[in-house]
Amino acid sequence: MGSSFQQYYWMNFLLLLVFILIPHASCCFSSIFSFGDSLADTGNLKISSPNETIHFFFPPYAEYLGLPLVRPYLESQKSIQNFEGGVNFAVAGATALDATFLEEMGDSNPRTNNSLGIQMDWFKEILPYFCNISSNCSEFLSGSLILMGEIGGNDYNDALLGGKSIEQVQEYVPLVIEEIGLSINELIELGAATLLVPGNVPIGCLPIYLTNYEGSDKSDYDPSTGCLNWLNKFVEYYNEQLQTELNRIRSLHPHVNIIYADYYNAMMYLYHSPEQFGFIGGTPKACCGGGGTYNYNSSAQCGMRQASACQNPEEFISWDGIHFTEAAYKWITNALLKGNYTDPCISSLCVSTL
């Protein structure tokens, strides 16, 4: 997922996952390699767009805590020392499908053309920094954790927000699933043995969509959450297809740990009872925005001069109408690592002390 280059950045999901996972998983994984979009980007978009102003809203917690950083691939000094803890290939705005194909389909994505295929090329380019022969690489990757996504959300976002119908966007699902499956298979063939693969989030609860489709029929909304049912049903369909593909890959590679991360149901649990967890800021309004029913305005997005941020972001689920707040990311991270939102349960690996 992605938004304006001018937005403030938040503590993203990957950083929180690493903060909580590494102290428990350091005995199992020597490195983390991450692919995806803005839910995992730790700097690649900023590096690839040096003339754009991107503000960082939170301090460098990982450095302060002494935790290994999963550094962005596009850092200029590529060496094994700089990438000791792994590499992050994720780029905000990235898609699963190739940018050229999406342009041919009439979808415009001005943020980045760094699709999953390009991120995979980066991975293969840097792999020799860690190992130099196939047997070496297989051994190295078997001790690494691969985070595959979330990726694919922007393929749907760009199409839906560009005016395509849900029926047209649904035709993208098998293509996105195929691209993710091909990448997973390629990583396994190179030696990967543990992969965490998230599904998509409930986009029907995001202020950007609630604003875009504001005025929809009352029956289109879930009365208990205020979310758009038809958009969330689409995400449910996509996530089901993704899990079917993961099951197919598991049957081909029974020795590999492929963990599905259920972002959708973890977030829906939060949306159904926000006050119970301290989110009293008026769900599903955004904390930072330019006004309107859901505090999202495409002409005054978070970070633009006309927008302003709330004083209590810890009480909001949505940060900028597109992404979640640090508090929400922390909640979902804990839910994934300590709850029932991964299949198989992530604690069934060596993370025994969670």
Task: Identify the function of each model-found stretch.
Residues 2-354:
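Conserved active-site regions of diverse hydrolases
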